[in-house]
């Protein structure tokens, strides 16, 4: 399988290369792709050295699969060019997610909808993935009426500049700012730009993408997204109201049996999800399950995942694995 990684020198791109190796993805030829300033650089992967190429060169090489993590503008311009030569593109940006003609895929939930005709496939937002993976089996059983989510998001979701800003501030060094305010010892209630309704793009991604992935626009979702000085992963406080009542132990059993979820919910041993322990892992961790005593049929939970892995790179490669296994590429 000829695989191009677009944005190979970026934070998510580097993790994608790592995950491809870890999961023994059937790569016969690797094509690392990056911006012009990185073209010609060499990267090591699986014991071999590869030269970084530009986008046009990569298109001409006609890869079977192109894994994109290079921003929305690059995806909008170049994903169709790859698709035209027969490449299947799996894109990490928000560029194609809400396009009605494109699938928005979390493999454990809706990979079976994919066909050979799907040449541009959208990977959901990191904070959406961990939430919908948890919600999907519960929606199937109890039907979700409303979701209230507050996110506590890792600076790695912003990128290398944000990590550098935190390190600079921690060490008392002046440097380039990824955020409009200090992030060290702070919480910034703005992830991405504001939309006309007063919500950020990140908050509205949680609303729109959840409805699309779960294929149910009747689910009411409201979100608040906060950036915090953490690197291990995103955390979410999620309040879910069902149409039907539930038993807490049944919810635990459903989540325990759901592929990709690790239940960490033992108050006696103070066991619950935390980003410092989610870092570097592919599962979504769920805990602090408790009945909402303020209204019926409602549960509170705490969801944590490594936003660079299941929230980005791993989910992308799981989609690619599904395509290969089912001979869709």
Q: For the regions a protein language model found, what residue spans apply to each?
A:
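N-terminal Rossmann-like NAD(P) cofactor-binding subdomain of oxidoreductases
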Residues: 1-183, 218-220, 284-285, 289-295, ...
